[in-house]
């Protein structure tokens, strides 16, 4: 085992959409910085960012009902929906900038217009959906949203969903043509190819073994070349851990105080994938339903048109599975090894409190294929068993942490952890994840490059014109920027 030493300005751990986005931003803002990226697999975007390991929804709250809460008085709080949409607007603006400047090309290889729709059954749910739409339509970001209970109109949008449906059940569906399907794996590959052209060191089959703080304030990152078994010690001023499910174990190695009292709970996702080309081509939408009362947000069922390498696909899910692995390509010991003296009570507290999640997971694990198809028939009444197969999607590690209110709170979002001095950042959590990559990386830059960020703002506004503003409060600006985005990304 040979050990070598090398110095750099920035180390990115993980070859997914988050590291690719941060690396791209840094090279635009401060091209002189030396950057090294390490990925354990043989190519980028193959774990959480892989097209089959996520639903590919450009999360904009156009169809996801869990982003709008219903009050006891029937009112609907759209605050989170607006925030999620604003985040995705930033991502689209940045991608459009990269296309315009020639840094990446062929947007149709990673983003497609696919209508986003919400689907509910039952009088109470229909009432909620109407209230949701009435609240959202007042906001410019949701101005194109439509709603219908008319069977003929719904049939024109999603004919397969109406075939064989009983006419006496109350249903309602919304339709928004501005929705998208995003292949984050393909986008990641484009971003990293661009980084390679800008002399960023891209190191595949390299595994990070340890991360230690040095006396001079820099970080020592110990990396193993899996091809040669050589071990390198890299010294870096800044480290970003964007390794999906592996981010938590790597963060724990840093021993920073912000890494204490945080745990992770892995959840595997299963989907039904359609094998019948006729069925696939007769549906063109991402249709999200409503989670059952008491079920976690990750359980929201959806029927998804996907585009994979130019081919149309159709998926339904998710169904939860369980594996103690933190990555699809991880170890069965990941969960056990993540339990430390400083987070044991945190983890146990969550286990006691999250009975609904435990109950949900047990019920999901016991589902037969026939029961999964029956769930699908809520969306497609005439779905046939032989047209569908079960596939395993990616692993997601839900964050468990202590809050001011209590110990062991399960978090269902995406979370950035930074060291006190801003020299290290880690990204934990799951949905909405990749869709919000640009906004999240701006957050990382603001927290970790405080002294430089102000001088970067003119360039940031060139790349993302609405940075620092809320498009929902600037109607004319939204329309102007959106025309540019539509032109370069070729979306609606």
Swiss-Prot record:
SUPFAM superfamilies: FAD/NAD(P)-binding domain. The keyword Oxidoreductase applies. Keywords: FAD, Flavoprotein, Oxidoreductase, Tricarboxylic acid cycle. GO terms for biological process: tricarboxylic acid cycle. Its EC number is 1.1.5.4. It catalyses: (S)-malate + a quinone = a quinol + oxaloacetate. It comes from the Bacteria. Pfam families: Mqo. One of its GO terms (molecular function) is L-malate dehydrogenase (quinone) activity. Its cofactor is FAD. Pathway: Carbohydrate metabolism; tricarboxylic acid cycle; oxaloacetate from (S)-malate (quinone route): step 1/1. InterPro entries: FAD/NAD-bd_sf, MQO. The keyword Glycoprotein does not apply. Belongs to the MQO family. This is Probable malate:quinone oxidoreductase 1. It comes from Staphylococcus epidermidis (strain ATCC 12228 / FDA PCI 1200). The lineage of its organism: Bacteria, Bacillati, Bacillota, Bacilli, Bacillales.
């Amino acid at each position: 085992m040979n050990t070598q030493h090398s110095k750099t300005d920035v180390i990115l751990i993980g070859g997914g959409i988050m590291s690719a986005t941060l690396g791209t931003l840094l090279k635009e803002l401060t091209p002189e910085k030396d950057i090294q990226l390490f990925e354990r697999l043989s190519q980028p975007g193959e774990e959480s960012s892989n097209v089959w390991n996520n639903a590919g929804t450009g999360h904009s709250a156009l169809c996801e009902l869990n982003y709008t809460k219903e009050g006891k008085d029937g009112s609907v709080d759209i605050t989170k929906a607006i925030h999620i949409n604003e985040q995705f607007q930033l991502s689209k603006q940045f991608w459009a900038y990269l296309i315009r400047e020639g840094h990446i090309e062929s947007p149709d290889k990673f983003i497609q217009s696919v209508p986003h729709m919400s689907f509910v059954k039952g009088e109470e749910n229909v009432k909620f959906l109407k209230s949701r739409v009435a609240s959202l339509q007042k906001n410019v970001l949701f101005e194109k949203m439509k709603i219908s209970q008319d069977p003929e109109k719904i049939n024109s949008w999603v004919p397969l969903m109406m075939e064989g449906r009983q006419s006496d059940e109350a249903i309602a569906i919304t339709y928004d043509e501005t929705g998208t399907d995003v292949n984050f794996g393909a986008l990641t590959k484009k971003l990293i190819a661009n980084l390679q052209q800008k002399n960023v060191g891209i190191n595949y089959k390299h595994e990070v073994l340890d991360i230690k703080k040095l006396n001079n304030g820099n970080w020592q990152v110990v990396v193993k070349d899996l091809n040669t078994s050589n071990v390198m010690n890299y010294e870096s001023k800044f480290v970003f851990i964007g390794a999906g499910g592996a981010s938590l174990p790597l963060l724990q190695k840093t021993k920073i105080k912000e890494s204490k009292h945080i745990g992770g709970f892995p959840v595997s996702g299963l989907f039904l994938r359609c094998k019948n080309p006729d069925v696939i081509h007769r549906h063109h939408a991402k249709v999200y339903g409503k989670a059952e009362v008491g079920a976690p947000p990750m359980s929201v069922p959806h029927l998804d048109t996907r585009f994979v390498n130019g081919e149309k696909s159709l998926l339904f899910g998710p169904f939860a599975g369980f594996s103690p692995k933190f990555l699809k390509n991880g170890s069965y010991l990941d969960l056990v090894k993540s339990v430390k003296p400083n987070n044991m009570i945190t983890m146990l507290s969550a286990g006691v409190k999250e009975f609904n999640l435990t109950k949900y997971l047990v019920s999901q694990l016991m589902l037969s294929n026939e029961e999964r198809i029956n769930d699908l028939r809520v969306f497609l009444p005439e779905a046939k068993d032989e047209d569908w197969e079960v596939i395993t999607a990616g692993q997601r590690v839900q964050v468990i942490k202590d809050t001011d209110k209590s110990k062991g709170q399960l978090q269902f979002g995406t979370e950035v952890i930074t060291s006190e001095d801003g020299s290290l950042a880690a990204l934990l959590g799951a949905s909405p994840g990749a869709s919000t990559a640009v906004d999240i990386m701006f957050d990382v830059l603001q927290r970790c490059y405080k002294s430089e960020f102000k001088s970067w703002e003119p360039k940031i506004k060139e790349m993302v014109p609405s940075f620092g503003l809320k498009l929902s409060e600037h109607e004319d600006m939204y329309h102007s920027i959106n025309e540019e985005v539509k032109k370069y990304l070729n979306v609606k």
